[in-house]
Amino acid sequence: MKLEIPFDEEGIFLERKTRFTGIVSVGKERTQAHIHNTGRLPLLSPGKRVLLKRAKSERRKTKWDLLAVEYREEFVFVHSGYHSLVAERILGEMFPGARIEREKTSGNSVLDFLVDGKTFVEVKGCTFEENGVAMFPDAPTVRGKRHVEELIRCVESGFRALLLILVFLESRCFLPNRKVDPFFSEIFWHALSKGVDVCVFRLKYDGEYLHSMGNLPICEEV
């Protein structure tokens, strides 16, 4: 999978003004950038280089969208608005020729995809790691737990269910973040035992393209 998402300008991150608004420096200008991500994003700290995309509408309060932030030796893609497009491309490779439908209702939840009317898919993006282990979530997620519970119900109803995790930074394996959200961690392992499939994909952003770097294993629980 290779998806073109070029950035327009490089800047310096100054501060997170609100959950979805950051202050950045672009050249000599101090301006606002939209942070399209509901996580805490601990890697987004003052002084970090960031890659920005110009907002399509001139009427918007924030002039820029924040695409990626410098972390160690790479730029980590943090714009969750692209997750569905990335996942759709990956699913197209996993299920060649399949009918892929977005946002399908199952029970009281809306899951991200339904493949060929048989496989429900929920997508989660991961931008946090600790000691080389990618972890989700980086903040408690009641909604994420509910989605995994619905995937379990899908399996119990005769469907196939897939939790697709997109990891955007260098890691050797993946674990649910028990320290941050023990309830999500518990339901994650329960889902595996109930037959929910989990696929973890590592993605790398080079400023022009988002590349799929292959699968990551699930670590032994620590």
UniProtKB/Swiss-Prot annotation:
InterPro entries: SfsA, SfsA_C, SfsA_N. CDD domains: SfsA-like (cd22357). One of its GO terms (molecular function) is DNA binding. Transmembrane segments: none annotated. It comes from the Bacteria. Disulfide bonds: none annotated. Gene3D superfamilies: 2.40.50.580, 3.40.1350.60. PANTHER family: SUGAR FERMENTATION STIMULATION PROTEIN A. Belongs to the SfsA family. This is Sugar fermentation stimulation protein homolog. It comes from Thermotoga neapolitana (strain ATCC 49049 / DSM 4359 / NBRC 107923 / NS-E). The lineage of its organism: Bacteria, Thermotogati, Thermotogota, Thermotogae, Thermotogales.
